[in-house]
UniProtKB/Swiss-Prot annotation:
Keyword annotations of the record: Acetylation, Cytoplasm, Iron, Iron-sulfur, Metal-binding, Phosphoprotein, Repeat
Any GO MF annotation of the entry: metal ion binding
GO cellular component terms attached to this protein's record: cell cortex; cytosol; Z disc
Residues covered by the Glutaredoxin domain: 144-238, 239-337
Gene assigned in the entry: Glrx3
Residue sites binding [2Fe-2S] cluster per the record: C161, C263
Protein name (Swiss-Prot/TrEMBL): Glutaredoxin-3
Modified residues (N-acetylalanine): A2
Amino acid sequence: MAAGAAEAGEAAVAVVEVGSAQQFEELLRLKTKSLLVVHFWAPWAPQCVQMNDVMAELAKEHPHVSFVKLEAEAVPEVSEKYEISSVPTFLFFKNSQKVDRLDGAHAPELTKKVQRHVSSGAFPPSTNEHLKEDLSLRLKKLTHAAPCMLFMKGTPQEPRCGFSKQMVEILHKHNIQFSSFDIFSDEEVRQGLKTYSNWPTYPQLYVSGELIGGLDIIKELEASEELDTICPKAPKLEERLKVLTNKASVMLFMKGNKQEAKCGFSKQILEILNSTGVEYETFDILEDEEVRQGLKTFSNWPTYPQLYVRGDLVGGLDIVKELKDNGELLPILKGEN
């Protein structure tokens, strides 16, 4: 009994509750050396209560990470500052800067994000020479993380300097497919990359791990029409939709995901699919407006959810219900019909 009480006490302390904007800002200042994960929650939402339990478990696994819960409606100034429009929402901070965000009750995704940020910022204690070697290997991996990598201040959605914003605009204008790294999220990378590539400023653009240059060089390449030949193009929407509809044998395009449907029709179709025992994957159309609108034309089907088997449209909820009632759904899902 005493041991159980002690364990409960440890779990309770592991997640800190913040009740004011001042307390939150103070916590950001104090926790600059560690990852800070903040859960914007509401006591009336059962999914938030569940995610608090998930946070408590993660806190046990990651004692060096600071986990915080903040009641969104009780501290509106913080919620408004970070554009919290629904609960649960999780924000990730490093060096007092927001580096990531997760909307919704997605326990596996929360766990993945925590693990990723912990590993990206952690270096084993070692000698200076080993640290330099480790950093060099890490920078090599980062510059090769995608065919085209942009190291910038902020993110493509929220650039935090004019040069980074201009760079993103040029890449988007030329339909260039790229991934990005926010140098504000990692001071070691920010300083190390300057030496690694012998380039003192940001943003920096890499293709196949090789430095192309900063904004001025990219502007020159754009003017000479060389940029399109150097950087990889993003796939056209139709090609992207073909890939998405064939991503799994059974693909459901819906509002929300398996864990949390965000409309009644999507919830009903999930229940039907779950009852079949057939494996399937989902795509949340609320997270990608281009896919949401494009798929309507691509398949000539104006509403959601939409179910695909091996890339072919089966239909929406009404058709899936009919197929189930006729005993035809399972053979179709298994590719037998």
